[in-house]
Each structure stands twice: as structure tokens, then as C-alpha cells.
Amino acid sequence: AASDVYKRQGVEMLEERSHIPVVGVAPYLDIQVEDEDSLTERFDRKQEVDLIDIAVIRVPRISNFTDFNPLESIPGVSLRYVQHVSELKNPDMIILPGTKNTMEDLLWMRANGLEATVLKEAAKGKIIFGICGGYQMLGETLSDPHHVEAGGTIKGMGLLPMDTVFAEKKTRTRVSGRFLELEGELQALSGAELEGYEIHMGETVLKGEAGHSVSIEDQVSGECKEDGAYCKNVCGTYVHGVFDREDVAEAVVRVLGEKKGIDVSQMTGIDFAAFKETQYDILAAELRKHLDMKKIYEILEQGI
């Protein structure tokens, strides 16, 4: 076919100009390996409130916003991104997301009044959940002796009795595990299995009455450890993708529904962990079909 001729000519031209082997041409694939919405579309959605209302604090350096896809997928759940105190309204749960600069974003929250408002909501018994940088913010102090971020030490929000020190070495790994036996407001999460990944610079040490929130196994090193923290209505973890498993997302909705006295038994989403795995399998099969896998493995083993 003419298209194959043009493709072959294009590959030859690229190899001639770059002096690098071209191992194939992958076609457009309609595969949902991550969220298709742009950040602008996601953040500019109407701030409508549904049966269960979850507010994510939209810090300036927000990262890993795909953490919230599983919650957004559940009918009857509204997930709103909030930048100002006036936008917060009266959510059932507040999430502090991951951030590229924990200390700067906490200072931003402090300056615009969102920190004080979140503290008031926590005092009323509202569920507060932090992921990675958002989890670090919940503690008592954040110290940066190596100038990984801004340097120095600042006061945290004080919702969890723990301290974080930023390290020079970055943690990057995949994990799986489960929620530990939680007491109080978040008891429904106890035992729920989770999987996700960690990517952070900090080490957090618990103290006082806080307990770890999850038990995880590093899928790379095999190391097992307890991670995160919880105390009463406040919970956090370093694990991104913590809501991907259907059991976790539905347990969160169940907790919030029970607090409001509404029936959420029909409010179910999809298992994002299983869905993503299926999509990755399709992607892998298609790439194998269109790429010179023998050449790729040869490069992996011997170099170019």
C-alpha cells in the first residue's frame, strides 16, 4: 500500500537525519491511560453541589490531580476545586492534594485564609484528607534543612501530631497495601485494599496519639512499612492513587453519606485500578504489534 511506502520512507529519512534507529510508527490509539480533560477544563467546571460534596483545595502548584478521578466518577458526588474561602461553602470532605512545593503552597493557604477555614471545618468534625504534600501540610512542622524547597522551618496546620523533614533523596516507587484498623469517623476504610505510587522528598515522623493510616509494600524493593497518619476525622498518606480501588472510593462515600444520614448504597463508580490495568494491556498489545520489539530489547540489553 502507498501508506506503507510513505511510512517506510519517513522512517528511513528520520534514521538518516538523526543517526538513531527508528523502531516503529505507533498509530493513534483511543486508550484512556489517564484523564483526557485539560487542567483548564477540569478547574473551570461549574461548581455545582451534589448529594455528596467534596472540595479539593486548588493550591497554585497542584500535582497528580488524577488522584480524584475515581471520586468524580461516582454518580451523586460533586468534586469541586476551590481557590478562595468564598468558594468552599459547606463540603462534606476537604482534600489537600499533592503539590510541587508543599511549603510555598501552605504559606499561600495561610495568606488567603483557606488554612484558617479548613481548621475551623476540621474542628466541626469535617473529614479532612491529605495526599503527599497535602498530607505533609497537616502536621505540626515542615523542615527543609537541605533547601529542597524554600529552606528553613515553618509551622504546619497542626491537625496531625507529626513532623516532616525534606530529604535530598527523592522517593519514587509503586506500592500496594491496605488501610489499617482506623477508629472513629473513618472506620469504614479499615481493611480496604489500595494500590498506587509514592513520589516525594520528605520523611514524616508521627508522635502522640496519631496512628498510621495504611500498611504498604514497596513493589520495587519488597519493603513493607506503615505509612500515613490519622487522628479522629483527619487522615493522610503519601500514596497517590489511594482512591483508585473501588473499595476505597466507595468506603469514603459511605462515610460521608452516613454522616449526612443519606443512603449511598446505589452510588457506585468503577474500579479505576482495574480499568487502568486493562487500558495498559491494550496499549502494550498495540505497541507490540507496531514496534520492532526485538530491536527494543536489543537496545535495552546492549545499548544503541
Predicted regions mapped to residue ranges:
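Long hydrophobic segments that form regular secondary structure
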Residues: 62-122, 127, 219-232
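Cysteine-nucleophile active-site neighborhood
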Residues: 99-185, 190-195
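Short, surface-exposed amphipathic charged segments that create phosphate/polyanion-binding patches used
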Residues: 8-13, 32-45, 96-97, 172-176
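Beta-strand->loop->alpha-helix junctions that form or flank phosphate-binding loops
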Residues: 15, 21-30, 80-86, 163
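Catalytic beta-strand/loop cores that center a nucleophilic Ser/Cys/Thr
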Residues: 182-232
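Terminal amphipathic helices with adjacent charged low-complexity linkers/tails
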Residues: 24-33, 91, 96
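Acyltransferase
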Residues: 18-19, 27-66, 72-73, 225-304
